[in-house]
């Protein structure tokens, strides 16, 4: 089962938690769900170059709090915060509520599955050889502390007549073990020959205690220098 299911969905409530954190009555649930989908789609399309890993949406009473995890926060914030203010106003219009925006910097994008998948997809669109792109990503992840990584590329790779799937793995990626911290990300490369899919699994170690936000804590943990490894920019 672990081979087929989304590793993040399998671990929800164990060492992962939801990216949308709010409660709504049945009458409001559908509208808020579609709002969340629209917000994520807009942010990912508008900030394609900002290497966004995930967008977390929380809804305190009649408000909306959006947290964006990005490897390039400067592209989101803009000169003197002009771009982030423009984005905040747009999100306020979409939600019809007072919206605050937090930007969290990812200091090790080389071991973030979503960012790795996006990077490989962009390379495929630039006609970089898929094996070279996969191998480079695997080597970078293992060098920066990943315990294992697997990458799948599928489609008309290299312009081949028949679509196929190629994969590359290094280290171990235990998909059945619930205590393992496995990050998972996907991306699509729109090439001249059609769409190629990219899937990435990154094993970052084991989380032994029960903690639904343990994986999130790891992404904002203190670095070796003693200072916070993630920089936050808050705009209310």
UniProtKB/Swiss-Prot annotation:
It comes from the Bacteria. InterPro entries: KH_dom (IPR004087), KH_dom-like_a/b (IPR015946), KH_dom_type_2 (IPR004044), KH_sf_prok-type (IPR009019), Ribosomal_S3_C_sf (IPR036419), Ribosomal_uS3_bac-typ (IPR005704), Ribosomal_uS3_C (IPR001351), Ribosomal_uS3_CS (IPR018280). Part of the 30S ribosomal subunit. Forms a tight complex with proteins S10 and S14. GO terms for molecular function: mRNA binding; rRNA binding; structural constituent of ribosome. This is Small ribosomal subunit protein uS3. Belongs to the universal ribosomal protein uS3 family. One of its GO terms (cellular component) is cytosolic small ribosomal subunit. CDD domains: KH-II_30S_S3. GO terms for biological process: translation. The keyword RNA-binding applies. SUPFAM superfamilies: Prokaryotic type KH domain (KH-domain type II), Ribosomal protein S3 C-terminal domain. Residues 39-107 form the KH type-2 domain. Binds the lower part of the 30S subunit head. Binds mRNA in the 70S ribosome, positioning it for translation. Keywords: Ribonucleoprotein, Ribosomal protein, RNA-binding, rRNA-binding. SMART domains: KH. The keyword Transcription does not apply.
